[in-house]
């Protein structure tokens, strides 16, 4: 079976899946042909199990449909194709069952002769050895002090401060925000997988997903999770060397080491940690010397069994100016998206923050704020702080009327921002689907009807032309938008549910 057939079927699957699902589970797969067999490699056991359970049946169905009736022999393995650099398989997957099924030095193979119709699960074959990155003894660290903390752009107010100096060359103050823990991280559908993966790494350092790569927009909780991992590691082992810093701090330290002719001390320092947590890795883009040094540091840490966690504002392969070899290595572990929180999670975040501040926040007031502040958690918390301050200074209870007063300028700005993006986000939340579903080519009614509603709202509430609306809905033709608008207008007359949905969405977007 040709690799081209596989790629063709993957492209068909891309059209069926939300972008986040495709990027997380299908995109990391590598494939190579071996005679009549197609070998598909997953970067770790968790991805292998998930693909086997959720997507293998559909993939086999597509391969059967487009393979001219030939029954493909497919093996799903942990590892990478032989043309790629060898790497270690994870030792402790997220699921307990997977942990029992996979040994530290094994590959799990799933073989499935597929008929032309959908095949369900595949049988697990005898594990075969996989090439692992050599594990070396940890370097001597007697000359280094433990370091934990954040050297990020905004130093948290409440933190444990530690100053670290490396033989006169490197000296900087770091902060670990003790208020960022797993216990006060509000979990929702948008961050559920990221939270679970971070907990697995924190509870089983060096034996979970390495590296763990979290990506998503600003203010969505990536940094919170990194601090939570660091706090948990130090709770389990107070002597652990956990380094949390912004990528720009790494660059600054390297520059300082070069100026002081202390690059060897720099290397020894960063390669002697138990866990390296680096925020906003996209700032390494187009910094060739920094990327070179980080590449070798990254390799040394993984070979030594030390944990690495990275974050970025975008999928690693989409970071322009970042070397391909770094992008490839970032995919060795688990890459997870953190999406904007849905309405229920935003309400839960507000209620939790109010409880921490010992402030009585009525549920309807929290719902009012959450409906209007949808961009990210940081803006949501900022709005709540303004409301609490206004309530305190005015000596009044928090009500919707007080919220309107304290957030007057912000709400006025939101009223002006009835954009197509805003409409897509609101409609997706209302129907409990993903924004990527609205942009996909899926035609099931559960997706197609909300998509038509969103198009009709975009025509009514924005000044965009039909071609412009079609373009931001996955590159659709203007006739598709016109049909959607006509269809929704008809349904508003004949379908009470659609009429009520449209009215509710219109009210949410304009009040």
Curated annotation (Swiss-Prot):
Keywords: ATP-binding, Cytoplasm, DNA replication, DNA-binding, Lipid-binding, Nucleotide-binding. Oligomerizes as a right-handed, spiral filament on DNA at oriC. This is Chromosomal replication initiator protein DnaA. One of its GO terms (cellular component) is plasma membrane. Residues 392-511 are annotated as: Domain IV, binds dsDNA. One of its GO terms (biological process) is regulation of DNA replication. Residues 135-144 have a biased composition (Basic and acidic residues). Pfam families: Bac_DnaA, Bac_DnaA_C, DnaA_N. HAMAP family: DnaA_bact. Residues 175-391 are annotated as: Domain III, AAA+ region. It comes from Pseudomonas syringae pv. syringae (strain B728a). Gene3D superfamilies: 1.10.1750.10, 1.10.8.60, 3.30.300.180, P-loop containing nucleotide triphosphate hydrolases. Residues 128-162 are annotated as: Disordered. Signal peptide: none annotated. CDD domains: AAA (cd00009), Bac_DnaA_C (cd06571).
